[in-house]
Amino acid sequence: MPNRKYADGEVVMGRWPGSVLYYEVQVTSYDDASHLYTVKYKDGTELALKESDIRLQSSFKQRKSQSSSSSPSRRSRSRSRSRSPGRPAKGRRRSSSHSREHKEDKKKIIQETSLAPPKPSENNTRRYNGEPDSTERNDTSSKLLEQQKLKPDVEMERVLDQYSLRSRREEKKKEEIYAEKKIFEAIKTPEKPSSKTKELEFGGRFGTFMLMFFLPATVLYLVLMCKQDDPSLMNFPPLPALESLWETKVFGVFLLWFFFQALFYLLPIGKVVEGLPLSNPRKLQYRINGFYAFLLTAAAIGTLLYFQFELHYLYDHFVQFAVSAAAFSMALSIYLYIRSLKAPEEDLAPGGNSGYLVYDFFTGHELNPRIGSFDLKYFCELRPGLIGWVVINLAMLLAEMKIHNQSMPSLSMILVNSFQLLYVVDALWNEEAVLTTMDITHDGFGFMLAFGDLVWVPFVYSLQAFYLVGHPIAISWPVAAAITILNCIGYYIFRSANSQKNNFRRNPADPKLSYLKVIPTATGKGLLVTGWWGFVRHPNYLGDIIMALAWSLPCGFNHILPYFYVIYFICLLVHREARDEHHCKKKYGLAWERYCQRVPYTHISLHLLEHSTYLICKLKYTSHLCTWSVCYLGFKH
């Protein structure tokens, strides 16, 4: 790890974020993890700056002396040059003493420059946790539309600017300030991504190696348990014969399904959008047609049912389909790793470039592997597994009717199918939102995502419907109504929080988002502190957990197996929350610490527990320790 260049207490010149202006600052601390210096301006403002944004004072003095001095020969030659009497003067030449006074006067103006909140931003100066909160109201977006059109990243910085640089003599025009920003952005060289992954997740090399065996075994265990008459946790199912786990016809049907969805992905329907900037910094294009693929799939399934195709074939060969999907995901992962060895450095994933074969194979070595315009990771994220989840649920519904000789499916099966159908349709309708997630922007495409998308999602998430086929549960209409209300509450929290976040990430200058308050960061982005995101840090996770509980409640309380999804999902979100916290702290530095002080609760349960008794608070930390003990199940889908 490189040594720090500037010591604590050293007085240097620091660049103000988003501008080309440097001010005298004092170094207060240095973060070894994020490589950011915390500096303090003369007015008391503290910011986290990169080392490239800090200069020694001597370099400024030397630059000034070089620019103001000239050689004696040049001075004598300029003074000896005469002007003809009949030639009109273009302008009155200032004396050296006058220019010297002007420079000193200009120097005073620069020294008197103050950092003051701009009037239009309506900054909130209320205090939180003993510190003044200087969050900015996003009111300048309407004015941006009237100004000359700027680049989207410059517009975002203009919305998020918390302070204006105003001299006591006169204020500089906004157009000049942002013209300087545009020049600075034009000459600025993009930062090169880090060559190697230093911080290993999921237990490092040993943990990822074990997970590659543990995850397929977990899927097989859950599927075999559901087929038993008594699916108790201690009632282990007998191991099936190896030849019974594989059927070539089933594998052929799975391949047909995969390439069937790939064909829908390639259809020239739906809009084409750009993803977030990569480290290059280029932007990839994506075709948004997942919802159209879902409609075409529904039409194809309806046609098969019309011609008396037995869809419950999925139920009869559910174990073989899970094994086929696992084998295909392993083959796909091997292909992805082999092709990633020839990928250029800038195309590698920041979290999957450790140099260790097993770890990079599991987490994904290449960030966005593509065959032409076909993005493999983006395709697998929402298409084969997510749409396949709905098809499996429908097959379980038809299997229940056939096995139990029912003319209508049970109310429990209807609730499970309806709730999960809503979740899938919502994901496909808001397909563009997945482009801002860590799956696309940070994680590579390896075994973790391939197995999660193609095996874990369709065969574990459909566990409730599969359970109800062999273990029917009768529930009353009032109970069904209560469960429906619970699912609607979870969905409302989940959708409203995600929509607010995704819309702000896409276009922070949107006039519809002018009510939002943000904490500006040194990266030019802002941290939301309004609405759900000002109440808890991960409100979308709360909605997910509530919906997961609503999906399991129709299965009753005879066995804990249908509630595996809820338990797993809490572990997943706790682990993902820890990853988010670490990533954001490293990226935003001091601004993230201010955000954590402003929004101290990670999810709503902690917010409510603060007002509870001391005993409940103790249980809160105990539950956190318990969830961490099984967090290795929490890989991302």
UniProtKB/Swiss-Prot annotation:
Chain intervals with Basic and acidic residues compositional bias: 98-110, 124-151
GO annotation (BP), single: neutrophil differentiation
Keywords: Cholesterol biosynthesis, Cholesterol metabolism, Cytoplasm, DNA-binding, Endoplasmic reticulum, Lipid biosynthesis, Lipid metabolism, Membrane, Nucleus, Oxidoreductase, Phosphoprotein, Receptor, Steroid biosynthesis, Steroid metabolism, Sterol biosynthesis, Sterol metabolism, Transmembrane, Transmembrane helix
Enzyme class, first EC level, given as a word: oxidoreductase
Entry keyword Membrane: yes
Compositionally biased tracts (Basic residues): 74-97
Gene3D superfamilies the UniProt entry points to: 1.20.120.1630, 2.30.30.140
EC number from the UniProt entry: 1.3.1.70
GO MF annotation list: Delta14-sterol reductase activity; DNA binding; NADPH binding
Listed transmembrane segments: 206-226, 250-270, 288-309, 317-338, 378-399, 403-425, 466-486, 554-574
Domain comment (free text): The Tudor domain may not recognize methylation marks, but rather bind unassembled free histone H3.
Protein known as: Delta(14)-sterol reductase LBR
Organism this protein belongs to: Gallus gallus
Organism placement in taxonomy: Eukaryota, Metazoa, Chordata, Craniata, Vertebrata
